[in-house]
Amino acid sequence: MFSNIGWGEMMILLVAALVILGPERLPGAVRWTTRSLRQLRDYASGATAQLKEELGPEFDDLRKPLAELNELRGMTPRGLVTKHLLNGDDTVLRDLEKAVPTTADLYGTNSGMPDFPKPKMEKPLARNEHPPIDTDAT
């Protein structure tokens, strides 16, 4: 439920609750919160159990498409191609990866980058010398 709240945030919330409620009312507030969360969880599990009882085997029929949607949500493009176009056989993709050369193969082992000539550095201007003006650029 609180999967994206870290220990630092929990400590800040605890200190804020201590300041706002005070040490006298804090234990009662914690008890009320835990009791409410347990009751909410019981309501949710009771509703799920009641839905299973009323729908019977149809409940499983409802869960199958939802499970398939969840499975598709987590798939990568490669996984989708493998599953639907290649019937789960990804040997074709592995063979294709072996056949296509990588950048390191094309340019040797020097970090995959070709050797480009370094740009020429112009000497600095003399004290009274003006920089060249490009009339086409202005």
UniProtKB/Swiss-Prot annotation:
**Pfam families registered for this protein in UniProt:** TatA_B_E
Listed transmembrane segments: 2-22
The topology of this chain with respect to the membrane is:
Single-pass membrane protein
Q: Which GO terms describe its cellular component?
A: TAT protein transport complex
Coiled-coil region: none
InterPro entries, alphabetized: TatA/B/E, TatB
Q: Where does the source fall among the domains of life?
A: Bacteria
Q: What are the protein's GO molecular function terms?
A: protein transmembrane transporter activity
Cellular compartment(s) = Cell membrane
Q: Where is this region: Disordered?
A: 104-138
Chief localisation class: membrane
Basic and acidic residues compositional bias, start-end? 117-138
Q: What is this protein for, i.e. what is its function?
A: Part of the twin-arginine translocation (Tat) system that transports large folded proteins containing a characteristic twin-arginine motif in their signal peptide across membranes. Together with TatC, TatB is part of a receptor directly interacting with Tat signal peptides. TatB may form an oligomeric binding site that transiently accommodates folded Tat precursor proteins before their translocation.
Oligomeric and partner information: The Tat system comprises two distinct complexes: a TatABC complex, containing multiple copies of TatA, TatB and TatC subunits, and a separate TatA complex, containing only TatA subunits. Substrates initially bind to the TatABC complex, which probably triggers association of the separate TatA complex to form the active translocon.
UniProt family annotation: Belongs to the TatB family.
Identify this protein by name. Sec-independent protein translocase protein TatB
* Organism (species): Nocardia farcinica (strain IFM 10152)
